[in-house]
Amino acid sequence: MKLLIAGGGTGGHLFPGIAVAEEFLARDKQNEVLFVGTWKGIEARVLPKTGYRLECITAAGIRGKGSLARAKGLAKFLYGYAQSRKILKEFRPDLVLGVGGYASAPTLMAARGMQIPRFIHEQNAIPGFTNRMLAKVADKIFISLEESRTYFPEDKTLLTGNPLRRQILEQVALAESRERGDDAFHLLVFGGSAGAHRINLTMGEALPSLKEAKGRLRITHQTGENDLEDVTAAYEEQGFTADVVAFIDSMADAYRWADLIVCRAGATTLAEVTACGKPCIFIPYPHAVDDHQRRNAESLLKRGAGFVIIEQELSGEVLAQAIRDLMDDPARLKAVGEAAQELARLDAAQAIVDEMVASTRKEE
């Protein structure tokens, strides 16, 4: 069988697609996968290094822009649609999966015109504009969080979770088997691959209020390149034991090590921390489209599987107080971590591939 995966732009869209591709290829050595994205998206940098085939088309957003920009976006959509039809005719996929991002729309619309089975996967609590539009032409809609179900037709929507790449799943399993080797309280702070400037600043402001816990607090803080020197200086000035890095190579090891995590609330982060069963203080990125990170975090909060501080209420003292309270309440930390792990769907990629393959058999 052949699977075409369309979309990307960001890691939050692309990496679930890679996880599905891994599962699909593992089913049969004869299976083939082709990605369709854009030259500007993260897929153009990541996929060539992984060995996956990638075809790039022209695509752009049209939402919330002026009339001229919308006209240009529509022209690019039509051009991308024509490119997608050509790719579909040449690759002749049995299945097409849209994972969100600009390239999804023209590709799935072209697949509809050619009567190829179509599926979409939504990673966030509030669906993106592209997936809301494509829901009308999709044969099945896979969702990561229950909250997004209301945006889609009930009879076509299936809760699968957010697929994690095999590398992450294997690292998590390996990390769980390792002993940590000390009795300190380990705090992990990170903001995605580029870091999160506001979290970096606020953590520095929180340090004076955490001085009483300095003796047993061990911190790993991933800052991104821009704030690395300033954050390192802040920890040194306050006398804290901290491993401050621009980028973390093995997130699974970092998760294993942590008793508590301070982080953003992107869909991939949620999938990974729940897979590891780790309690988190989520600080949602306030400028995410439709404020979806806040809704992602609230999805865990209402299930007792995480804590949330919104940026409008964030300060050094507020963050320090939250950390102190949780350091002093190990039973609560354990309960929240267990609740998070109950929400994990380690079989998300399997569930999606199962459903796509089963759908084609029904048509036969």
Swiss-Prot record:
NCBIfam families: murG
GO CC terms: plasma membrane
Keyword Glycosyltransferase on entry: yes
Catalytic activity: di-trans,octa-cis-undecaprenyl diphospho-N-acetyl-alpha-D-muramoyl-L-alanyl-D-glutamyl-meso-2,6-diaminopimeloyl-D-alanyl-D-alanine + UDP-N-acetyl-alpha-D-glucosamine = di-trans,octa-cis-undecaprenyl diphospho-[N-acetyl-alpha-D-glucosaminyl-(1->4)]-N-acetyl-alpha-D-muramoyl-L-alanyl-D-glutamyl-meso-2,6-diaminopimeloyl-D-alanyl-D-alanine + UDP + H(+)
Alphabetically ordered keywords of this record: Cell cycle, Cell division, Cell inner membrane, Cell membrane, Cell shape, Cell wall biogenesis/degradation, Glycosyltransferase, Membrane, Peptidoglycan synthesis, Transferase
InterPro entries in the cross-refs: GlcNAc_MurG (IPR006009), Glyco_trans_28_C (IPR007235), GlycoTrans_28_N (IPR004276)
CDD domains for the chain: GT28_MurG
GO molecular function, one term: UDP-N-acetyl-D-glucosamine:N-acetylmuramoyl-L-alanyl-D-glutamyl-meso-2,6-diaminopimelyl-D-alanyl-D-alanine-diphosphoundecaprenol 4-beta-N-acetylglucosaminlytransferase activity
Protein name: UDP-N-acetylglucosamine--N-acetylmuramyl-(pentapeptide) pyrophosphoryl-undecaprenol N-acetylglucosamine transferase
Amino acids binding UDP-N-acetyl-alpha-D-glucosamine: T10, G11, G12, N124, R165, S193, I248, Q293
